[in-house]
Amino acid sequence: SLGFGNLYSTPGDHIGHFYQSREEWSDVAIPFVRAGLEAGEKCVYVIPSKVERQALLEALAATGLNTDRALATGQLELDEGTHDAKAMQDFLHRALSEIPAKYPFLRWGGDMTWSLKKLPTSESLMTWEAHCNTVDNPPAIFLCQYELRAFAGSVVMDALHTHPLCLVSNTIHRNPFYEKPEAFLRNLARRKATETTRIT
């Protein structure tokens, strides 16, 4: 279970959630992480500030979860993100290396506003997003949450191109704008050769 809306996922699902308010964000992020912890899964959530991380922990604790234990054992990792796509890829593969020896499954989520503080260009962000689609049969699901007001329209369109599934009004939809990673990265490299686009 994804933890919200009576929705279920399959291994390898990469879901884009495009939201307009923090309430929309929390209505998805909190139950998503909670469901993973309750199922004994490894949970990673990337979130940009200490204040927001603390708020997420408090919301999870309010549901009855022992967040201190989850953090201490490594079942739950809250991270602020890194400065380049390669470092994020390494982080992902380190988390995947714990499956299934320590945990049955990896639940990876992120409030993508972390990239506004960490990554220099939209190309770096989209290289990371496309990489998530190249991992063969991952024992994982990925949820990427984009605040529409925070990102340029061109970045939102690229995010659509890198997510096979989209969450809209508590319904998962196959994304008709999705491009396979090889084709997307070729197009991205072609664009990068002529222009570098800032994230905001």
Regions found by a protein language model. Give the residues of each.
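Non-catalytic regulatory/interaction regions at protein termini and inter-domain linkers
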Residues: 1-200
